[in-house]
Amino acid sequence: MGRTIVVTGGSSGIGRAIAAVFAAAGDRVFITGRTERTIVAAAKELDASHSGEVIAVVCDSTRPRDLAKLVDEVDEHVDVLVNASGGLVAGKPCDDPLEELSETWSAYIAQNVLGAVLTTAALRELLGPRSTIISIGSIGAERRGGAYGAAKAALAAWSAGLSAELGPQGVTANVVSPGYITGTDFFQGGMTDARHELLVGETHDKRPGTPEDVAELVFFLASPGARHITGQTIHVNGGAFTTR
């Protein structure tokens, strides 16, 4: 019998690739998204092309009422929770610069930190020994990432604390931190040829990453072979940012 997986932000890009790799292994995968049309379509396509069942749940991870519905929908032990929702936030013009700045930062924190915190708290009682929580971070947390980078840095700090909190119960928690990944909404909008060449040039393998690169690492972290890996931020960027 397959595992039960929850992937937030599963309608496209990295989240969808993560859902696909688990569904291909025969797992039962719940994917969430804010827009009913796109999340339902993604679930149907993934379900039709993989052995595992894929179920769509319309859910905004920053809204407690939506998360209560997600818990009711899942209603069983969760083996793997992947917090993949987040990304850039479209700012709202405002006459007051400070008010605009406040709203922008609040939105980035909500989308990239609070959603993961609330989703994990909502599903906490469905997690158990040998469950794992994987949150998608960003290379922006290590660089001049502005509000987005600051939010992803906060996500990593929260995840490390979560690992310490839940470790005694046999639950692992890690962050997977991608660099430049093609085929995602994050990079598609304003990507110029010059910017593409610059980002690829920063890597050691001279290629952009793919959503599948991230998904395969997430899949490994959810495997029995990764039970002693917890409290970590693991980078997937082709060497564009290195650690020691």
Feature roles, as predicted:
Residues S11-G13, T35:
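Conserved glycine-rich cofactor-binding loop
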Residues E100-T104, T132-P168, Y180-I181:
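Catalytic loop of short-chain dehydrogenase/reductase
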Residues G167, T172, I229-G231:
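Short, small/polar-rich loop/turn modules that mediate ligand/substrate recognition or access, typified
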